[in-house]
């Protein structure tokens, strides 16, 4: 997986690819944090703590959106695909 590090010698990887790796790893971590907070919110019995955990989860969603936007701006193919699929009512799956 991408968060396990580089799969090619670091000297052979461009700065741009290394930055993209950082961004993809960060996006994965933010989405994982959202998942963990969702589970904590579901399991939590204390309503005050549940509200705090939900707030923290939503901040992770903001972080994920920021990183995804950085990726979109840096990668023309992601830009095209995200513009094609996000915020539309068109079919998502290829049928």
Label each region the model flagged.
Residues 1-95:
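Iron-associated oxidoreductase/ferritin-like identity signal
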């Amino acid at each position: 997986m991408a968060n396990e590090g580089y799969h090619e010698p670091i000297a052979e990887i461009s700065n741009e690819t290394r930055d993209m790796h950082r961004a993809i790893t960060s996006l994965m971590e933010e989405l994982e944090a959202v998942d963990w907070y969702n589970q904590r919110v579901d399991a939590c019995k204390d309503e005050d703590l549940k509200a705090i955990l939900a707030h923290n989860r939503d901040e992770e969603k903001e972080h994920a959106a920021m990183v995804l936007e950085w990726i979109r701006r840096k990668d023309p193919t992601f830009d095209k695909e995200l513009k094609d699929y996000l915020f539309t009512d068109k079919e998502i799956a290829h049928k």
